[in-house]
C-alpha cells in the first residue's frame, strides 16, 4: 500500500501558456481586465485538445484568480494551479475586455494549432482550449498568442495530471471497537481518505445537506450513537462516499412499505434499534425470523435526554454476512409496538427499473423533467446523455426504498435522451424521446399545371384548400377535389415535413386559393393566385428538334448506365437471418446488430486442405453451396459430409464483408438440433468458406412433393400395404415406438443423458430400445413413407428451432419450406442458404420496390412497412404450416402477386384449410395470420401446443395398437384428427388452384 501511495504522488505537469507579447509599455492601471476560468466537463470526444467550438457539457465555471506577472518581454498573466485526473476533461478559458478584433494562435510542442476567438454578449473576447481525455502524452506547454489592436498578452496555466488507475475510494463500513461500545468507521482508498461522521437530529431530507441540524466530526471512532441520522463519509481525490447506519426507530410510525436493507455476501451488517420512553423501565430485543440473536452479536447503550426521558439503542451486527443472514429482523420493546426490516443478502449487486422506452411531447416553453425510478444496490453511478453529450445525474431516495433521478436541463430540445446507470455488478439504460410541438409554417409555389404547399410542424399537420371569390382575403369555400397530399416525412427527432398539391385544372385558372396546414398548435395559411398558362409551344423547326435530341442523347445513355448499375447493386448478398436489438415496445423500435466490428474467433478456423469438394448442392447469383468431405472437423481421423457455403469468384468487398458478418453471427448463435449448425470456417489464405451440417434429403418443400404418392394418414394403412413385413421387428419390444413415431425433443436426447466423454449412463434395456428405434427409422426411410405424424413432427421441430432463434433475438425473414432441410431420421433443420438460390428466376421472389421479396410468405407489416420482427416470422411459420399440410403446394394457389393480392392481404384474407391438416392445426395457422402482430402466438406457445398434439398422436397410436397389429382402418378413429373423411382423396394441386381462384 505504501508503494502505491508513493506511486500515486507521481504527477504529470501540464503547462498551458496563453502567450501574448507586449508591443508597448503599459502600467498596472493600463492592463485590461482578464479573467481566467476553469470549466470541468464530461468526456465526449478524442483525447486531443480541441478549440472551444467543440460541443461539450460544461459544469459551473471556476475562477482561477488570474493575476499579472511582470517579465522583460511583456505582461504574463498567471492562473492558479489546476488538477485534473487522467482521462478527465477540462476547458481553460480566458475572458478579456479589450477593444477591436482579436487574432490568436495555439502552439504545442513547436506545432501550431487552430484558434477561434469570439465575443460574448458583454462584448468580451473569449479564447478557450478544451483538453479532452487527458493523457501523459499531452504534458507540456501550450502557447496561445493573442493579438489585439491595443496590445498582446500572455496567460499561464499550470495543470497537474493524476494517474487515476492508482487511485481508489471504497465505500466506508462500520466495525465495533474492541472492549468498547463504539463504532469505528473504515474506508480504504488511495490516496488515504479522510473520514468524518455526519450526525443529524432530524428525519427530514435536509440531513443530507448543510444545515443547523447537521453536526460533522472528523474522527474515525464514534461513541455517541444516539443521534437520529448517523452517516460515515470518506473523501479523497476521487470524490466522496457515504454509508448510513440503518436504523429502526420505534417512536416513529411504521413506513407504508417494509424497510429493506441490501448487502452482498462478505459485507458487514449493522442494524440499530432505537426507542425513547419516559422512564428506564423497558428493554429492547432483536429477533431474526422469530429467533433471538445469539449473544455477542449485539450490544446495548442507553442515556437520558435533556428532558429526562430514557433513550435506549440496541445494535445488531455481523462482521461478514452469508446467505443464512437473510430474513426479517424484528426489534421488540415492552413499551413500544414491534417493527421489522427485511435484510437481503445478495451474491452480486443489481439495478431494478423499468427499461421500456418512453416518448413525450411538450410545448416549446413547457417545464418538463424526465425521471427514472429505480432500486439498486450498491449505490449507482449515473449520467444523462443527449446528442453524444453527458450531463450530471442527481439521485434522491424515496420512502419506499426506491430512488429517483430527474433531468430537467434539456432546454426543450427534441431528440433521444438516455439515462445510464451502473454499479460494481450491473448496468442499466433507459431511453426517452422528446418531441416539441410546433405550429406549421407554410411555403407555397405554383407551376403551369399545379399549385403546391409544403409545411413543417409537430404533430403532423393536416391540409385544407379553400377558394376565394373576387380576390377577397376571406376564403371560405373548401375545395374537395383535385387535392393530393404527399406522404409525410419526419426529420430525425424533429418536425413532420408534409406537402399538399392542387391540380389547377380542377379548380380553374385565374382564381385565388388558400392552402392551410393545421395541428394542435395552430393554423398557418398561404394564398396563391392561379395564373392561366398558355399552350405549350409546338416544335416546328426540325433542326432545333434534332439538336435537342443530340444534346439529350448523352444524358439518356448516362441515365441508362446508372439505372443498370443501381439494378446490379440493389440485389447485393445479405444474410436473411439477422440478430436484432429491441429498443422500445413498438414493432419498429429495433435495429440489426452489426457484426462487422466483432472479432472472429479463430477457434472456428478449419484447414481448407482438409476439405474435399464434391457436387454443387445449389447455385445462385451471389454464390453456391457445395457438398464436401471434411477430414477431422468433428473428431480426429473421422471424416463427415458437410455443406460448404461460398461466394462467387468475383464477389465484391461488400458481399465478402456480409459473409464474414454472417460467420460471426453464427459463432455467437450457438448450437441447436433444429438449426443447420455451423461446424467451422476457412477465412485464411483464400476465399471465405462457411462449413455447415450436411442434410442428405435436401429441402423440405421438394421432400414433401416427392412423398405425395407415398403419404399415409396412419401406420395401419402402411401395415396393410406392406403385409406387416416389418412388424416382427417390434414384437419383442411392445413398449417401443412405432416406426416414425419419434419423440422429437419431447424427452431429453441420449447425448444429454451421457457423460462428457460419451460414456452412457443408460441401462442395457434403454440402449437396446434406442438401437431398435434407430433401426426403425432407417427401415422407415427405406420404405419411403410419410404419415400425418411426420407432418406434425416437422411442424414441431421447426417451431423448436424458431423458439431457439427467438431466445437468441434473431429474426429469419425468409422462413419457408424451401429454407428447411431434411436429414436422417426425418429431422428437419432451419437454414439460410439464400446465396445459393437464383432469386432472379425463382417465382417465389417477386420484385417489390428495389428488392426481390418472398411476398407470399411475408407478414403485412413486413410487406407494407418493411418491419421484420419475431412476430413477422410467426406469420411466415403459418404459411410454412400450410405448405407442410398441403404436401408442398404453393401458398395462395392460383392467386398472382399483383395489386389485387396486396388488397386481399390488407383485407384480412386467409387461405383455406389444407387437405391434410386437422381443425386444431388450421386454428394454429389462423392464429399465426392475425393482422395485428401482437395477437399472434409466440414460438414457445406454438412449441407447447404442437408438442401436446404430437404426444396425443403417439398415445392414440399406442392405445390402438394394444400390442397387436390393429384391425381398424385408422388408429386415429377415436380423436377425429382430420377434417375430411378418411377415405376421401385429396384434390390435386391443379384442383386446389381452381378452388382458390373461385374463392378469391
Curated annotation (Swiss-Prot):
- Gene Ontology cellular component? cell surface; endoplasmic reticulum lumen; external side of plasma membrane; plasma membrane
What ranges does the record give for the region Disordered, renumbered to this chain? 45-67, 968-1000
* Domain of life, source organism: Eukaryota
Residue ranges annotated as transmembrane are 545-564
Q: Which reaction does it catalyse?
A: L-tyrosyl-[protein] + ATP = O-phospho-L-tyrosyl-[protein] + ADP + H(+)
Q: List the disulfide bonds.
A: 36-66, 104-115, 200-207, 273-331, 369-408, 382-393
GO molecular function terms attached to this record: ATP binding; cytokine receptor activity; phosphatidylinositol 3-kinase binding; protein tyrosine kinase activity; transmembrane receptor protein tyrosine kinase activity; ubiquitin protein ligase binding
Q: What does the entry report regarding how activity is regulated? A: Present in an inactive conformation in the absence of bound ligand. FLT3LG binding leads to dimerization and activation by autophosphorylation.
Q: Where in the cell is it found?
A: Membrane; Endoplasmic reticulum lumen
The UniProt annotation places ATP binding at 617-625, 645
Where does the record place the Protein kinase domain?
Answer: 611-946
List the stretches on the Extracellular face of the membrane.
28-544
Name the membrane topology term.
Single-pass type I membrane protein
Domain Ig-like C2-type per the UniProt entry, residue ranges: 254-344
User: What enzyme class is recorded for this protein?
Assistant: transferase
Which modifications occur after translation, per UniProt?
A: N-glycosylated, contains complex N-glycans with sialic acid.
Entry EC number(s): 2.7.10.1
Mutant phenotype after disruption: No visible phenotype. Mice are born at the expected Mendelian rate, develop normally and are fertile. They show normal blood cell counts, excepting reduced levels of primitive B-cell progenitors. Mice lacking both Flt3 and Kit show a reduction in both lymphoid and myeloid cell lineages. They appear normal, but are born at a lower frequency than expected and exhibit severely reduced viability after 3 weeks, none surviving more than six weeks.
Signal peptide range equals 1-27
Q: Describe, as the record does, how this protein assembles with itself and its partners.
A: Monomer in the absence of bound FLT3LG. Homodimer in the presence of bound FLT3LG. Interacts with FIZ1 following ligand activation. Interacts with FES, FER, LYN, FGR, HCK, SRC and GRB2. Interacts with PTPRJ/DEP-1 and PTPN11/SHP2. Interacts with RNF115 and RNF126.
Protein name according to UniProt: Receptor-type tyrosine-protein kinase FLT3
List the taxonomic lineage. Answer: Eukaryota, Metazoa, Chordata, Craniata, Vertebrata
Amino acid at each position: 500500500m505504501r508503494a502505491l501511495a508513493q506511486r500515486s504522488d507521481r504527477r504529470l505537469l501540464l503547462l498551458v501558456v496563453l502567450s501574448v507579447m507586449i508591443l508597448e509599455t503599459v502600467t498596472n492601471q493600463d492592463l485590461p481586465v482578464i479573467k481566467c476560468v476553469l470549466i470541468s466537463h464530461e468526456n465526449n470526444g478524442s483525447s486531443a485538445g480541441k478549440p472551444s467550438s467543440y460541443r461539450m457539457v460544461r459544469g459551473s465555471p471556476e475562477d482561477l484568480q488570474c493575476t499579472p506577472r511582470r517579465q522583460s518581454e511583456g505582461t504574463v498573466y498567471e492562473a492558479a494551479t489546476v488538477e485534473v485526473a487522467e482521462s478527465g476533461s477540462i476547458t481553460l478559458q480566458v475572458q478579456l475586455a479589450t477593444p477591436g478584433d482579436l487574432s490568436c494562435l495555439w502552439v504545442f510542442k513547436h506545432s501550431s494549432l487552430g484558434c477561434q476567438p469570439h465575443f460574448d454578449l458583454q462584448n468580451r473576447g473569449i479564447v478557450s482550449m478544451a483538453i479532452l481525455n487527458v493523457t501523459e502524452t499531452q504534458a507540456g506547454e501550450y502557447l496561445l498568442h493573442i493579438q489585439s489592436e491595443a496590445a498582446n498578452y500572455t496567460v499561464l496555466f499550470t495543470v497537474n495530471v493524476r494517474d487515476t488507475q492508482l487511485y481508489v475510494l471504497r465505500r466506508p463500513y462500520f466495525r465495533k471497537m474492541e472492549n468498547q461500545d463504539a463504532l469505528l468507521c473504515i474506508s480504504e482508498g488511495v490516496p488515504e481518505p479522510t473520514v468524518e461522521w455526519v450526525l443529524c437530529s432530524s428525519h427530514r431530507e435536509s440531513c443530507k445537506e448543510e444545515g443547523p441540524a447537521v453536526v460533522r466530526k472528523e474522527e474515525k471512532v464514534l461513541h455517541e450513537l444516539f443521534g437520529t441520522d448517523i452517516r460515515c463519509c470518506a473523501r479523497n481525490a476521487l470524490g466522496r462516499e457515504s454509508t448510513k447506519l440503518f436504523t429502526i426507530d420505534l417512536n416513529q410510525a411504521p413506513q407504508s412499505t417494509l424497510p429493506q436493507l441490501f448487502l452482498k455476501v462478505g459485507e458487514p451488517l449493522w442494524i440499530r434499534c432505537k426507542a425513547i420512553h419516559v422512564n428506564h423501565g423497558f428493554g429492547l430485543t432483536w429477533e431474526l425470523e422469530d429467533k433471538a440473536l445469539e449473544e455477542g452479536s449485539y450490544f446495548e447503550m442507553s442515556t437520558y435526554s435533556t428532558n429526562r426521558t430514557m433513550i435506549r439503542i440496541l445494535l445488531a451486527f455481523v462482521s461478514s454476512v452469508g446467505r443464512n443472514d437473510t430474513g426479517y429482523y424484528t426489534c421488540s420493546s415492552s413499551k413500544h409496538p414491534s417493527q421489522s426490516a427485511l435484510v437481503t443478502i445478495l451474491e452480486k449487486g443489481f439495478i431494478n427499473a423499468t427499461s421500456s422506452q418512453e416518448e413525450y411531447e411538450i410545448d416549446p416553453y413547457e417545464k418538463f423533467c424526465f425521471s427514472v425510478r429505480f432500486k439498486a444496490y450498491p449505490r449507482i453511478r449515473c449520467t444523462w446523455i443527449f446528442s453524444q453529450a453527458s450531463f450530471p445525474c442527481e439521485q434522491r431516495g424515496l420512502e419506499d426504498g426506491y430512488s429517483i433521478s430527474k433531468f430537467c436541463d434539456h432546454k426543450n430540445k427534441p431528440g433521444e435522451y438516455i439515462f445510464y446507470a451502473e454499479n460494481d455488478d450491473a448496468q442499466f439504460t433507459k431511453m426517452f424521446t422528446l418531441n416539441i410541438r410546433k405550429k406549421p409554417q407554410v411555403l407555397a409555389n405554383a407551376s403551369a399545371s399545379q399549385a403546391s404547399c409544403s409545411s413543417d410542424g409537430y404533430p403532423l399537420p393536416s391540409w385544407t384548400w379553400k377558394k376565394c371569390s373576387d380576390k377577397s382575403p376571406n376564403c371560405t369555400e373548401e375545395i374537395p377535389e383535385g387535392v393530393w397530399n404527399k406522404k409525410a416525412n419526419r426529420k430525425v427527432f424533429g418536425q413532420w415535413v408534409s406537402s399538399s398539391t392542387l391540380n389547377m385544372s380542377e379548380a380553374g385558372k385565374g382564381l385565388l386559393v388558400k392552402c392551410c396546414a393545421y395541428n394542435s398548435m395552430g393554423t398557418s395559411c398561404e394564398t396563391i393566385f392561379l395564373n392561366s398558362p398558355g399552350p405549350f409551344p409546338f416544335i416546328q423547326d426540325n433542326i432545333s428538334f434534332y439538336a435537342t435530341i443530340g444534346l439529350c442523347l448523352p444524358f439518356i445513355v448516362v441515365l441508362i448506365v446508372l439505372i443498370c448499375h443501381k439494378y446490379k447493386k440493389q440485389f447485393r448478398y445479405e444474410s436473411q437471418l439477422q440478430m436484432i436489438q429491441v429498443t422500445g415496445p413498438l414493432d419498429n423500435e429495433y435495429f440489426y446488430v452489426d457484426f462487422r466490428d466483432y472479432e472472429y474467433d479463430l477457434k472456428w478456423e478449419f484447414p481448407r486442405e482438409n476439405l474435399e469438394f464434391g457436387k454443387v448442392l445449389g447455385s445462385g447469383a451471389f454464390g453456391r453451396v457445395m457438398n464436401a468431405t471434411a477430414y477431422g472437423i468433428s473428431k480426429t481421423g473421422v471424416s463427415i459430409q458437410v455443406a460448404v457455403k461460398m461466394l462467387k469468384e468475383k464477389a465484391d468487398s461488400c458481399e465478402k464483408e456480409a459473409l464474414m458478418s454472417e460467420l460471426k453471427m453464427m459463432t455467437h448463435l450457438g448450437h441447436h438440433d433444429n438449426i443447420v449448425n455451423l461446424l467451422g470456417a476457412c477465412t485464411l489464405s483464400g476465399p471465405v468458406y462457411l462449413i455447415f451440417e450436411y442434410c442428405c434429403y435436401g429441402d423440405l418443400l421438394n421432400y414433401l412433393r416427392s412423398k405425395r404418392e407415398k403419404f399415409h394418414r396412419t401406420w395401419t394403412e402402411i401395415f396393410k400395404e406392406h403385409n406387416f413385413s416389418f412388424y416382427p421387428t417390434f414384437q419383442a419390444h411392445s413398449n417401443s415406438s412405432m416406426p416414425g413415431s419419434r419423440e422429437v425433443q419431447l424427452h431429453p436426447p441420449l447425448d444429454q443423458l451421457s457423460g462428457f466423454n460419451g460414456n452412457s449412463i443408460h441401462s442395457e434395456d434403454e440402449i437396446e430400445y434406442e438401437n431398435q428405434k434407430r433401426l426403425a427409422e432407417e427401415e422407415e426411410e427405406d420404405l419411403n413413407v410419410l404419415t400425418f405424424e411426420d407432418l406434425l413432427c416437422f411442424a414441431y421441430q421447426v417451431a423448436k428451432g424458431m423458439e431457439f432463434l427467438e431466445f437468441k433475438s434473431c429474426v429469419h425473414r425468409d422462413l419457408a419450406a424451401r429454407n428447411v432441410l431434411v436429414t436422417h431420421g426425418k429431422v428437419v433443420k432451419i437454414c439460410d442458404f439464400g446465396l445459393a438460390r437464383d432469386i432472379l428466376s425463382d417465382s417465389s421472389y417477386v420484385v417489390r420496390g428495389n428488392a426481390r421479396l418472398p411476398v407470399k410468405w411475408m407478414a403485412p407489416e413486413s410487406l407494407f412497412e418493411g418491419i421484420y420482427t419475431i412476430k413477422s416470422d410467426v406469420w411466415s411459420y403459418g404459411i410454412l404450416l400450410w405448405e407442410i399440410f398441403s404436401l408442398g403446394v404453393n401458398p395462395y394457389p392460383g392467386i398472382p402477386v399483383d395489386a389485387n393480392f396486396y388488397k386481399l392481404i390488407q383485407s384480412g384474407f386467409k387461405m383455406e384449410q389444407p387437405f391434410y391438416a386437422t381443425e386444431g392445426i388450421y386454428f394454429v395457422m389462423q392464429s399465426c395470420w392475425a393482422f395485428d402482430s401482437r395477437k399472434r402466438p409466440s414460438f414457445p406457445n406454438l412449441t407447447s401446443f404442437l408438442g401436446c398434439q404430437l404426444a396425443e398422436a403417439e398415445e392414440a397410436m399406442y392405445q390402438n395398437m394394444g400390442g397387436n397389429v390393429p384391425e381398424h382402418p385408422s388408429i386415429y378413429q377415436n380423436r377425429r384428427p382430420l377434417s375430411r373423411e378418411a377415405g376421401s382423396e385429396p384434390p390435386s394441386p391443379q384442383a386446389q388452384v381452381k378452388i382458390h381462384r373461385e374463392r378469391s
